[in-house]
Swiss-Prot record:
Protein name listed in UniProt: Amino-acid acetyltransferase, mitochondrial
One MF term in the entry's GO annotations: L-glutamate N-acetyltransferase activity
Gene3D superfamilies: 3.40.630.30
PROSITE patterns attached to this UniProt entry: GNAT_NAGS
Organism: Aspergillus fumigatus (strain ATCC MYA-4609 / CBS 101355 / FGSC A1100 / Af293)
Top-level EC class: transferase
Reactions mediated catalytically: L-glutamate + acetyl-CoA = N-acetyl-L-glutamate + CoA + H(+)
The keyword Amino-acid biosynthesis belongs to this UniProt entry's keyword annotation: yes
Amino acid sequence: MSLHTGWPRTVNSSFLKKHRSSLCTCQHTSSVLPRSFSTTPDRHVQQSADFSSTSRSYDRLGRRAREKLLDREFFLSLLSSATTKREAKSYLARLKAQHPKSPDANKPEPEKSATAPTLPSGVNLGSFYGASRSVYESPVFRQGPSPSAPPSLEPVERLHLALVRLSTPQSLDDNIIDGVAKTLSQLNRLGLTCCVVVDPGTEGVASALRQVAIEQADRLAVAIQKQPDSKSLRLDSVFSIDPSRPGLPQVFSRKALLNPLRHGHTVILTPIAYTEDVPRAIIVPANDAVIALTKELAGLASIPDPDEDPMVTAERIGRLQKEVSLDRVILLDPLGGIPAFNRRQPSHVFINMEQEYDDIENELLQAREMVPATETSLLKAGPNSVADNNPISKFVHAEVVPVPSGSTPELKTAVPQRSAIEGHLENLRVAQKALAMLPAASSGIITSPFEVASSAQTSPTSEFSAVGTRRQRNPLIHNLLTDKPLLSSSLPMSRRGPTNNGQGAVYPVTSHTTFVKRGMPLTMLPNPWTEPWTPQSRPRLKLDDPSIDLPRLVHLIEDSFDRKLDVQDYLNRVNDRLAGLIIAGEYEGGAILTWELPPGVEDDGSEASNARMVPYLDKFAVLKRSQGAGGVADIVFNAMVRSCFPNGVCWRSRKNNPVNKWYFERSLGTWKLSDTNWTMFWTTPGLVEDSQKFRDYEAVCRSIQPSWADDTGVVD
């Protein structure tokens, strides 16, 4: 039975979609919906329509009002997740580009006439010389195959997906599950369809884990089904495995997986694979299921025939990759984001895998060795029983993300038997393996279901007034809109100060969400770990060194500043005072840093001269196509202030530079230089208290002459 016609309201309304899905979804029973409709009450309503038209109109008005309220709640959540209007517009532009109109969409369709055929001259002869209508419509029996229309050559619209792994949902209460379901529903409405893998954990026998996985998948499906304009479906028999060859499971049918996703369903999978020889259900690690799905959705699952032409193989894989774009890999784990032991923050905000993966993995491995063997008992004892001088122990006691106010699940059941650090290692590794198979534009998010659910909660004042305190940003919605983490990774901890949550409680703005990118390699010349950047370093690096691609560096500067550089004049100025160079990726971003002396101080190499040298950021550039996305600026800035110049650096910027807000947030201080168009910034601690050093910084920022070829017309 189809519900596409016969209703007075549009089929896209939440009311109709809700009940249409109850008839079309094969995996759910009537328990999915809070109500069921029988035919008898419907006939009774139809017979009494003349006497209850007023009540029916009120009912229709109430339903429309409820739908408007739900839409308003959705858009408020959407707008609150974007930090700026520019980011919201940028997302809408990307969404429009993902759904281009076909070139024939605006062409009027030719009218189909029910009349008889015409002569070539266009004269309609009616049915006089033609067969009657009954002859035209009579069935035709053919011995051979019926002629079929040629297949449509129009490309299938690309499906944008998020692959989600939800860990131990049995430890989460209904409020958390509902909040996660609401967020997944909102992602679907924003054009990012979700495929969820339920991870029951590793505690228990295989048969019990299979049952838990099925029950929790149904539980999440019901929660999603309750959301407006949402459909969910639990798929069975998705994975197959060869017991004779241990390894990753495989997706049994790509078509069976993609069809419900194309129809707007949130598909929920259990990590259960079936053996190929004798059908037998086997529980597999959820991370293996995530990797197998990533491999399939990336078009890399098929094994090429050795005798097949490589061009044919590449073309076949290319067609598969054009069908699906796996944009996000989302790991929802009660552990939250990847912890940062060496920094003054609870977790890594952003991880550039190409640059940081090995270091963070080694950091976690070292932390695991330091965890005491009695960690399970310590976890139950609480954080007060841990010595304050052991940062690793502090982390082990607080590895589960604090639950927001208003939610009080039993956190002790969310602590898995494996160590917390081992869980973070698995999250880091599965994110790295998945992103390695995906395009550079794809990204990963590691966060807690508590954080997602708390940001999805409806504000108590939203039903009455749109005026109120800005709600907490949803990390998943925010990342979809901006392709950025909730907090910039280059933002100092002092800038993540306390804020008011609208109820009188003050809490620190910290993020337990880690944003992960395959990223780009980072090159620092010279390597500050082997050759620290000091004024005494000799000989100094030069920009025309063979290890530097000068033409690409010049293009980076000119593209970023939108101005032509006087290359020779610039080389003459910086080559004898270059401190180092930072390059992100294939010259997508970079920084040129120098040692500068105040006017009147001679560079004679003496200790007094070296003591007066000022660490100066001469050029900070990011290609236009990489600005505002991908974290290129954060990667370069972090390398500068953490690795190259940890004791501080200064730079200047024109007072009307739109990037100054970004500089203000990341500097320790600023100073507007009088009688100039410059503002000085610095990250040096205690600079204001050191009057001599402050005067040197100011003198350098005043005295440096620009090296632009088109310097006329721009007042510096």
